[in-house]
Structures are given as structure tokens and as C-alpha cells.
A protein has these predicted regions:
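A short LG(V/I)-centered, amphipathic sequence patch enriched
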Residues: 1-10
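Secondary-structure junction motif
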Residues: 140-163, 227-235
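Beta-alpha-beta core module
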Residues: 102-109, 113-115, 176-224
């Protein structure tokens, strides 16, 4: 603890300890829920991290209609935090954009996919084009996700090392609309189209990459995890809906 004149704040180590304590409490609560869900009556809580797709949500609704004592908790955070919680067992599943680390996780491809492109000011020169090519991307200051796997995906598409891109800023999770970044003129926002609002503000526009770069969502879970009966039923229901 750091004691000030009027308040006490946590040190960096204290912040880490608090985060670990929160994870432990979450894991204890989940373990209690799992023990309940392994009774003959299917019940308990299923925890899902990341950005749930409509397929995942529809499956959750169907499972709830069959087993009303099953409940869901959705947890939104950056990829590192979600993977840590998946690793520690406080999450059953996570919804991620591919690529997936298949050495550590089992996964189920989901039908939802999206295309990569740039969010930009409507009045800029690049907005006059129907698409964004490699040359455009390399000449443009970018605001890009910090997840290494996604950066490698773009690097492979452009056949260019990520260090050679003009990356003005990176982010992990965006709260609210990303258009504020465009209006600030910090850079152009490299993202997938499905993460944008259904209706964009008139002074911004989205242009897809060319050649097109589509990416698919997947549900992932820890390969060695011991799943509750409720989680097993959810996964079974989801597999039936996507096959």
C-alpha cells in the first residue's frame, strides 16, 4: 500500500495480488456452481469469455429452454485476460477470432465470419476507393489490435513484417464506438466489419481490404479442462447447431 495524505492506493504488486484474489474468488464460485451442475438435475453456471456470436447466444437460449436451472455469465475483456481465466478454470469457454493456439486449446469453428478493413474519415482520399490494398495499408497510420495472432495475420496478408507498418496506436478492448479515434486524426482503425456499429456516423466509412481477408470466429476451451455437465450439454448443443 502507498499511504498518501488523504488516501491509500495499491502498489503495482498490490494490484496484481488483488487481480489474483478476484480470480480465486471467481474460481471458487465457479467450482461451487460446477458441483451443483453435476447433480442429476442439469443446472449451474456456464461462463463464456470474449465476444459471443449470435450462434453462441442462440445455443444458450435453446439450452435454457430445456434446462431452466442453467445460467450463463458472459465476461468481456482483452484476449490476455480471457485466456488467463480460461487457463485458471474460471471460464468454461471463450469466443475468439481465429487463428487459435491449437496446441493449448480445443476449438469449434463457428459459422460467423467477417472481413478486415479500415475505418476512415469519409472525406479522405482513401475513402474515394472501394477497397484498401497493401500499398494503401503500408502508407496509412494505423490503430490496430495488440493481439499478436491478429497482427501476424495482417503481416502475412501484406507479406510485410509488422514492424514495417505505420502503427500509431494499439488497443486491447474498445469501449464505445471506435469513431472517436478517427475523428481525433490519430490514425485509421484496422478492424473487422462485424465489430462496427450497424449504422456508421456520416463522417466515417469502412473500406474492406483487397484481396479480401475474411476471418472466422471459434469457440475455444482448455484441452485438459474437466467440464461440468451443464458445460458438456452446451457444447453438445452447439456442435449440433453448426454441423
Amino acid at each position: 500500500l502507498i499511504r498518501g495524505k488523504r488516501k491509500i492506493t495499491l502498489t503495482e504488486d498490490g494490484i496484481i495480488l488483488r487481480k489474483r484474489a478476484e480470480e480465486i474468488l471467481s474460481l471458487v464460485e465457479k467450482t461451487e456452481s460446477d458441483l451443483i451442475s453435476n447433480t442429476p438435475l442439469i443446472s449451474g453456471e456456464i461462463t463464456i469469455g470474449g465476444n459471443p456470436t449470435i450462434t453462441v447466444l442462440n445455443t444458450a437460449a435453446r439450452l435454457r429452454s430445456k434446462y431452466p436451472d442453467v445460467h450463463f455469465q458472459f465476461y468481456s475483456s482483452d484476449a490476455i485476460d480471457v485466456l488467463e481465466r480460461l487457463e485458471h478454470g474460471s471460464l468454461d469457454f471463450a469466443v475468439f477470432l481465429e487463428p487459435i493456439d491449437v496446441a493449448e486449446y480445443d476449438y469449434l469453428p463457428l459459422p460467423e465470419s467477417s472481413c478486415w478493413g479500415l475505418l476512415m474519415p469519409s472525406g479522405c482520399e482513401l475513402a474515394k476507393k472501394d477497397y484498401v490494398d497493401k500499398t494503401d495499408l503500408l502508407e496509412t497510420p494505423l490503430i490496430f489490435h495488440r493481439r499478436v495472432g491478429l497482427q501476424q495475420l495482417i503481416s502475412h496478408w501484406a507479406d510485410t513484417a509488422i514492424k514495417d507498418f505505420n502503427i500509431a496506436a494499439t488497443y486491447n478492448v474498445i469501449n464505445g464506438s471506435p469513431t472517436k479515434f478517427i475523428k481525433s486524426r490519430l490514425g485509421f482503425y484496422l478492424t473487422t466489419e462485424d465489430l462496427l456499429p450497424a449504422v456508421l456516423e456520416p463522417d466515417v466509412c469502412f473500406r474492406p481490404l483487397n484481396p479480401p481477408l475474411e476471418i472466422q470466429y471459434a469457440l475455444i476451451w482448455k484441452r485438459t479442462a474437466l467440464q461440468s455437465k451443464a458445460a458438456e450439454m452446451f457444447l453438445q448443443e452447439l456442435k449440433q447447431s453448426v454441423t
